[in-house]
Structure formats: C-alpha cells, structure tokens
Amino acid sequence: MATPMTMPKASSGIILFAHGSRDPQWRLPIEAVARSIEREQPGLAVTCAYLELCQPSLPDVLADWSTNGVTNISVVPMFLGAGRHAREDLPSITEALRRQYPAITIRLQTPIGEDARMTELMAQIAVSSALQPAQ
C-alpha cells in the first residue's frame, strides 16, 4: 500500500475504510484488496484506514494525502451492510474532513457488501462450499 515514502504522484486515490481490530490477522484481507488495486491501477493512490483499534485513521490518511497532491478521493466502506458506523460515524467523519480540506473532493461510497456484484459473489462462494464433497 502507498505510504508517504512510496506514494505515487497521483491526484486520485481510494481509501478502503474498515472498522479495525487489535488482531493483526484481521487486517490481512483488506490489505490484500489494497495490494490488488495497486497492481491493477498503479496510477492511483490506495491505502486502508480504520475507525478504531488500529492505524491509520481516516483523518491521518487525509492529512498525509493533502500534502501529497491527492485531491480526488473515494472512500470505500469495507462493510457488508450499512450499520451504525456506515450510516452515522463515517458520514460524520467524512463531513468534518470536507470542511477541513475544502480543496479535496471526498466521495463516500455505499458499503461494499451492498453492491450487487458482491452479493452475487458471496452467494457463489456459499453455494460452492455446499457442493464440495464431504471430507
């Protein structure tokens, strides 16, 4: 993932926003998504940010990116549904950041789990697990 030392000179970026956990293993799937985006779209800045329990926070990422020329940001909530964090906490944080960084466009996406493509993928994974031979 892009860090201040290795960040590409990109004007657009993606922040994968997740809840956070004290367990370092919990972060691995989300960080794998970020690495996949980096491989597929090397001209985009991409990183993960967390609500709590691990770093960096969304405000930390914006503080860094604001000094590195990233002015068009998509925040992608890595949640399966729109619970309280997606409905209340994240919009509140995002609105405060828009006020703090008026020159930066911050677009808050719907939670990833509410995308029909993700719903279909999860259904396919569940079905394939049921069709595997018993071991």
Model-inferred region functions:
Residues 1-135:
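Active-site-proximal alpha-helix that buttresses catalytic centers in soluble enzyme cores
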